[in-house]
């Protein structure tokens, strides 16, 4: 999914538009210039600069690209740049290396077999959060595939990879504290997610099983991915699911569920103190691996049914004066946020974290439409709008009979 972020109390969806300004070279032809995203200001001045791409994108002193980093330009806006292609050459100016990088991505998109169309561009990002969500639990992708995705994101100036590392389909990141998460819950018995889940197979196996599907990233591989992304000015935000979507965890550590059995529960037992020990130790490992300001903790689609009959959860509710299971979930989210804040990080959760009371500093990712995001913004919280109807990639794009397997499966 794509995701867009605005600051407190204001939510806006991207609308691309251009404004004409300064002329750069005399019109000879009328080139078609298609850029994604469209720059804030652009004038197509006509004609082409006849250069081979190698003359521009090489790092050699003979490169025809004149680039300048001026920290005072545009007030130091880190993402802004100015690009001019004229009959005499190409100039690129920015306040930071990040802005320079984005200008080069625009230049890459401009190149055609005829050369570079003559343009004058001034550009800066409208949205500070330009994200893509990758679910590697239901469908595992090795690090090389993640690298390819990061390259595509960089090409379109996207700056956040939302890395969905844990879910019922498998646990995908190495933990030194809880090694059974990857020995016992990273490989399932069917590569087809829908067959495995909807068909009630729902079993995990070990890596040496011939029918095993899955895998995980070692901590060193995570560091490689984070570094590769950083080189492209992309921040990787890990998502570790609490308190729901934890079906796989209980195949490794069943004592963290209300039933104490594998394959029964989907939610952590909030009344069990060991749950909070697990949470803090796992998040501490993620904080060491991911330097991102934000950590995504899920918070969506908790079944909550096991909490209603769990003696430990009911005892905690009585102790804390919680009226219902929605407030019990909110209690957990508040504790997660307090822990993250103590480590200098901030919490993002799906819009279900509104239920039972929103944690004070939480950022809400609104996926069940727009209303959760609007409500959160009115409460003074930052919001990332990700309404599934518009932004999920796994919907059918046409008649399902003509399309590949969609909505979670292949």
Model-derived features: positions:
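Sec-dependent N-terminal signal peptides
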Residues: 11-21
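Active-site neighborhood of glycoside hydrolase catalytic domains
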Residues: 249-250, 254-362, 367-378
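Bacterial N-terminal signal peptides that target proteins for export
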Residues: 2-13
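Conserved alpha/beta catalytic core and glycan-binding cleft of carbohydrate-active enzymes
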Residues: 354-360, 367-410
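Acidic, contiguous N-terminal accessory segments
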Residues: 18, 25-130, 341, 346-354, ...
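Feature activates predominantly on carbohydrate-active enzymes
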Residues: 76-277, 282-294, 310, 335, ...
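Structural recognition of the beta-strand scaffold that forms the well-ordered cores
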Residues: 130-133, 162, 238, 294-296, ...
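Active-site beta-loop-alpha junctions enriched in small/polar residues
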Residues: 137, 166-170, 241-245, 300-302, ...
